[in-house]
Every structure is written in structure tokens, then in C-alpha cells.
Amino acid sequence: MADPHIKSPMDFLDYLTVIIYRTGFVIAALAVLTVSWYPDLSLTFILIAATCCASSLHIYLKSFRLLFQFATWIGLLFYINHYPALALGGALLTLGGLCFKEYFCFRVPLLNLQPIFVACLWFSWVLNNLIALRIFSIISGVLLLVLAIQKWRMPLHFDIGDKTKYQI
């Protein structure tokens, strides 16, 4: 997690990856909100969102960074091999985990429970429970949207923090 009080020098790739990361949350919010109405299209965009976030992740601890990146990669592999439920699970693991991380920056109410909400969303998808899917897609989508708005309101360097703390 970045230290907002530290402003490390940023190059073009730093700016680009922060923009990609934040855009991922916008895409995720819209895709999750529509998942019960347009499941195939939403799944594609949820995977795109998770890829944006995981590919451009600025987190100090290498183990968590790799966990979120590999969950997304595995989700993408399941997607191209026609296992949509498992693909969705990998993407939601990444997005839910990142929301939990971001909770400690913003203290958005209920954001720390996002991993539980996306797990319920996933189970609703797998069990084909449309009512539960709509409920959890609205809860998760709104939380992602609030997070996306909060992220875009702050300076880009807040996502980077102290570059000397990153585990390589």
C-alpha cells in the first residue's frame, strides 16, 4: 500500500500503470453491476478489469502482488478454456482482494467486506440464483464504483508511495 505523504519521482510508466489500475476499477464497477443482465459480456469485462488492476498493481509486498496477478492469469486461462465460472472466480479473487487492500486507504464503509460480497456473487453465479446474483452484483458494483471515484479524486502519486519499499 502506498504512502500518500511520500512523493517519489514518477516516470511515464508510473503514470500509465496508475491510470490503468484506476481504470480497472471503473470497468469492474460497470461490469459487476450488469453481470446478471449480460453475463457473457460482463464476464469478459470483469476479466479485463482484473487484468488492468493486476498488471499495474503497486503494492509493496511481493507475495500479495503475485497472488493477485496469478489469480488473474489463472482466471484468464480458465476463460480461454471455456470454464467461465472458474474464470470469474479468479478475477473476483483479485478484485475483492484489492478492494480489501484499498479499504485501509479510504475506510469506505463495507469495502473491507468486499471479498465476502464477491464470493457470494460468485456462488450466486455458479448456483444460477438470479435474485442473489442481482443483490450481490448491486452491492459489489456500488462499492467498486465508490472506490473508483475515490481513487480518481486523489493525486496519481498516492498510488506509488515510497519506491524504495517495494519487494522486487
From Swiss-Prot:
Superkingdom of source: Bacteria
Localization in the cell: Cell membrane
Transferase keyword on record: no
Membrane topology: Multi-pass membrane protein
Parts of the chain that traverse the membrane: 15-33, 41-57, 73-93, 108-128, 129-149
Pfam families: DUF2301
InterPro entries tied to this protein: DUF2301 (IPR019275)
Gene Ontology cellular component list: plasma membrane
Key words of the record: Cell membrane, Membrane, Transmembrane, Transmembrane helix
Keyword DNA damage: no
Protein name, UniProt field: Uncharacterized protein HI_0120
Organism expressing this protein natively: Haemophilus influenzae (strain ATCC 51907 / DSM 11121 / KW20 / Rd)
